[in-house]
């Protein structure tokens, strides 16, 4: 039993790590005064909420790391959360970075790119966009109005004629000399103005060009400009102005209910709401700490940081947070909690969005709850399947064997918990042995970290089911985790032996001779089939990536003059094998320490591979 002794802990700023019985870090926090913060948890008159009491009962040790400043503590906390992935810290389910649009004005004919990382590289970034659907819709609008090039310059120039987008009027084909640099720059300026929210500038310019075209009787050009104007008007109509001249700001709203907090972020760019994102979080610790940690996690993922972040209240250390955000962005960022005026109304709007999102999530949760109850009933599970894990193995003739784990948390895909496993101990194509290794590694780690699934679904029949049962027996987990195998439907002859029919998906359970079927078309069957397909997709995708890397790597190493040291230098300079392959001859020649002749050989080798 852990006994808290305040005198043991420093009064300086720093980070604290709460550890469980096996030494596993389950919570990481920061504080301006470590002793004061920890005392607030353990004192008699401290926070008595059930979730706090629950958390503190699991503490067996607390480690502290002192820092010189609060900002250092903030940065260290972020680093440790990424390293340990503590169970009770905020987990943003969509742990991928958001999409942004990138345009490098230094290129001769710039193009728009979809990127997930915002770098301080001199390029212009627009976003973030919470969904790929939203950003692709924006791109389509831009290409319709301003037909910028769509493909990398090298691949464009290697074509014998312009691409299909040129034929349908959505690319100006600068790679084949179909537009002058001056006219192309006008398209770029228009696209940038539209993305920055300066539609009036674009409209005024197009109206002037249209009038000039009509005056010189260039009616086709005038009609094209008219269509561009109409497209802009339709786009602008769909965007709501919430603060004229308000610039770029992210607005955070918060809704509390029970032991949960719903946070909504409105992305406001040039006074218009361009997107929204919401997160449902467990309310373990105090609100200030929750909000501060959330902002660190959110903005620590290479997203576009705006001029201002508007909050419902200022958490402790908001000045440090603003300083950190400014450093990340390279420009000053304000963190504000407005008390009145338009900005206060924006925060209230974000709070209403958070509440609405919570209600919608609750309705979906109730529906998923019913589906999970049906799964538990039909598959004779001994516990409610809050967390379901499905495993799959992928290899080609025993090469690049990988395992995958897809996860459902309360019936919803938890993509942040998906895992790949490189098979270490199995030579050749032995799916059963590979599956044994993957399950053993996963469950041993689960025992150490006290994070076991409720239900394991195997992609396969009795053979795969026997493997998981063996692993559970060896780890004394039989009875603590439910298991089943899902076998794909079979093709069977009908009674006349002529036509073929497809049987239902079959579920195999331990200790049962016959399989169990779920009703065709039922939500329960759909949920489990989707999970099985996700595990398969995740394994195949990673397997293809490994094969592609290996192929590219072998091409690189076969080039005379490229050894292990040179290969590492190329990867460090360009960032990836794919980037080396896509590099132009000029970019290769510009790499420090790479002889011009070798740069030409590398470029020629990859060009030959493209055309072969």
Curated annotation (Swiss-Prot):
It is found in: Cytoplasm. Residues 11-90 form the GIY-YIG domain. Its main location: cytoplasm. Coiled coil: none annotated. It comes from the Bacteria. PROSITE patterns: GIY_YIG (PS50164), UVR (PS50151), UVRC (PS50165). GO terms for molecular function: DNA binding; excinuclease ABC activity. The keyword DNA repair applies. The keyword DNA repair applies. Belongs to the UvrC family. This is UvrABC system protein C.
């Amino acid at each position: 039993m852990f006994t808290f002794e305040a005198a043991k802990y420093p009064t300086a700023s720093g980070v604290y790590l709460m550890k469980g019985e096996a030494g596993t870090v389950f919570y990481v926090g920061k504080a301006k005064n470590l002793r004061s913060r920890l005392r607030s948890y353990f004192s008699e008159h401290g926070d008595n909420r059930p979730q706090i009491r629950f958390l503190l009962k699991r503490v067996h040790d607390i480690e502290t790391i002192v820092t010189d400043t609060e900002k250092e503590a903030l940065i260290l906390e972020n680093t440790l959360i990424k390293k340990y992935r503590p169970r009770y810290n905020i987990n943003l389910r969509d742990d991928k970075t958001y999409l942004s649009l990138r345009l490098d004005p230094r290129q001769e004919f710039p193009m728009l790119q979809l990127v997930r990382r915002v770098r301080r590289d001199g390029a212009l970034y627009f976003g973030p966009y919470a969904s790929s659907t939203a950003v692709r819709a924006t791109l389509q609008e831009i290409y319709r109005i301003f037909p910028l090039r769509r493909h990398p310059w090298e691949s464009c120039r290697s074509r014998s004629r312009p691409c299909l987008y040129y034929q349908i009027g959505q690319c100006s084909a600068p790679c084949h000399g179909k537009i002058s640099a001056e006219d192309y720059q006008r398209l770029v300026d228009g696209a940038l103005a539209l993305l920055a929210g300066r539609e009036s500038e674009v409209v005024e310019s197009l109206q002037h060009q249209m009038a000039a075209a009509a005056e010189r009787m260039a009616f086709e050009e005038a009609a094209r400009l008219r269509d561009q104007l109409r497209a802009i008007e339709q786009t602008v109509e769909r965007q709501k102005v919430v603060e004229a001249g308000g610039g770029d700001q992210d607005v955070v709203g918060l809704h509390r209910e029970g032991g949960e907090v719903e946070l909504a972020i409105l992305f406001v760019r040039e006074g218009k709401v361009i997107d929204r994102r919401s997160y449902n979080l467990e309310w373990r610790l105090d609100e200030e700490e929750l909000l501060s940690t959330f902002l660190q996690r959110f903005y620590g993922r290479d997203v576009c940081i705006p001029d201002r972040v508007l909050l419902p209240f200022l958490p402790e250390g908001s000045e440090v947070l603003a300083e950190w955000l400014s450093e990340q962005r390279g420009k000053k960022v304000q963190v504000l909690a407005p008390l009145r005026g338009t900005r206060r109304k924006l925060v209230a709007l974000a709070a209403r969005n958070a509440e609405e999102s919570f209600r919608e999530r609750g309705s979906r949760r109730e529906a998923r709850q019913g589906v999970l109850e049906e799964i538990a009933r039909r598959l004779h599970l001994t516990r409610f399947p809050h967390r379901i894990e499905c495993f799959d193995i992928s290899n080609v003739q025993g090469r690049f064997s990988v395992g995958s784990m897809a996860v459902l948390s309360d019936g919803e895909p938890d993509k942040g918990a998906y895992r790949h496993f490189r098979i270490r101990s199995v030579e050749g194509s032995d799916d059963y042995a590979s599956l044994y290794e993957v399950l053993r590694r996963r469950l041993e780690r689960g025992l150490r970290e006290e994070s076991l699934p409720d239900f394991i679904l195997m992609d396969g029949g009795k053979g795969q089911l026997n493997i998981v049962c063996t692993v559970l027996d060896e780890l004394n987990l039989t009875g603590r985790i439910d298991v089943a195998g899902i076998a794909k439907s079979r093709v069977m002859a009908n009674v006349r032996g002529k036509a073929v029919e497809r049987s239902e998906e079959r579920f195999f359970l331990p200790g049962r001779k016959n399989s169990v079927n779920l009703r065709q078309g039922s939500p329960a069957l759909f949920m489990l089939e989707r999970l099985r397909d996700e595990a398969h997709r995740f394994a195949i995708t990673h397997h293809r990536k490994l094969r592609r890397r290996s192929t590219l790597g072998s091409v690189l190493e076969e080039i005379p003059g490229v050894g292990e040291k040179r290969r590492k230098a190329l990867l460090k300079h360009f960032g990836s094998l794919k980037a080396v392959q896509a590099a132009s001859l000029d970019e290769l020649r510009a790499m420090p320490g790479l002889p011009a002749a070798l740069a030409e050989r590398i470029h020629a080798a990859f060009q030959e591979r493209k055309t072969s």
